Amino acid sequence: MSGIVSRLSVLGKVWLGLAAGALALIVFGLAAPGSSLFFPLVSLWCNAALFALALLVLRRAGIELDLFHKAVLVGLWAAAVLYFYWTLGSRTFLYHWDYVNYILKQYHAEAAFAQNTGAGFRFLLDSITEDYTNFITLFTEFPFCLSGKTGDDYAFCQVFSVLPSLLVLLVGLTVKVGRMLRVKNRFWYFLIGFSWCATFPFVRMSAVLGQPDWFGLIFAFMLMLLTLDYRFDGIDLPRYLLIFAATAGIILTRRWYLYFVVGYCFAYVLLLVVSSVRLAKSGQQSRAVHRMVRLVVFGLCAAGAMVLLLLPMVRKILSFDYAGRYSYYNFGGITLELAAQTLRIGLLNFILIGMGLWFAAKRRLPALPCLAGTELLVSLVLFTRVQNTGSHQMLLFVPGWLLLFLVGSAALADGLKKHTAVKLCYWGFTMVFAVSVRCSPLTTVALPGFVVDHFPLKAVSEFVRLDKLTYDRTDAAQIQRVDDWIDAHCDAEK
């Protein structure tokens, strides 16, 4: 037995350890139902399994991280810990409305598992048709269980439960895109591309406000890593299973991520059709036909299995009037949404995107910009048929925008021989600007806090006042006294 284990790869040993851990959890759950340790241990196992799955996706995608990549990854994660600690500690934010939903779900999940193991898992499964599923609570319980269990604690704990897997996959995506674009200056490309994407304000916006919806980006990055350069030239069952798992994971995170899935799949199929037509014209008709046959067979099988797996959700989607339910949030349609996207992305990012489009056109590498643009357009059109986006729903567009940022980073890195100081200053200024952006419920334009507080236009002075008051409450003590009085003098049963 020891000889078999010794011959396993490191990743194989990790999966063996996870299997042993799962077995131990099953025994523990049966032996001690209702134990306060069971749910945190399940959460710890889920986080370990998710990280191992991320590493498995990297391996299947042909990505190997060297010491430089790992050092930058660890350094940026450490910087993120400091950023969250400082940001959450320098404000007084009251978690309410949408911003308290996940925290309450975490409390309810803990209470359900405190009853017994079956009640806990039943609580998780019963939410599959809801707007906010309980899927994420499996991963955020640890290390939230070790904290003071406040709203700020919940936001901070995401740095340990969500961010590691997210950053590992973002590193892999950065390397993958650089390889596809045949970047020459790989050192600067990786530094610029990875840091640019990781500091994009709308990646972390919802997390800072207590909404762990960025968890879905983990599965979005998995899907992109597994498909960006895959053309169905051969049968790859492990890859198919991973694609299916990533798609199911992103749908279970938040239902509106379905718009990204539909948009990305449409763009990917369109890209594959175009490449197959070009193959056929070059005399490789048989190869082109086999590509399309494999794609159609996989697509039909995956769609059928997904419908069966998520049948309650599918029934809810088909029978529910979402346009009527969310009409309150449909405040301008696609015209206003395009304006909102423009303001959120900002001039600095659009300059980078423009450089990337020129770079791709000059090198005759249109696939990635076209894929990202098509995905963004389809997702945008479909989503605005129901409602307009808030800051957290911006996450469903983030993968497409990040893909365009990476193409622009390739252009910036390979063009450093000219105007080096100017380009590095542009990158550095953008990083400082992005990290300084205020993450507020009222954020419309991604601007640093000191810019928002001293915005020169009098027409928006009231909006600025409300934004500052919402982000950093000065009346928290008064609200607490009112709450204490209600608790002391009012009977909840009456």
Q: What kind of feature is each model-predicted range?
A:
Residues 430-494:
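Membrane-embedded, lumen/periplasm-facing catalytic core of multi-pass transferases
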Residues 3, 49-59, 166-176, 269-279, ...:
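Hydrophobic, aromatic-rich transmembrane alpha-helices
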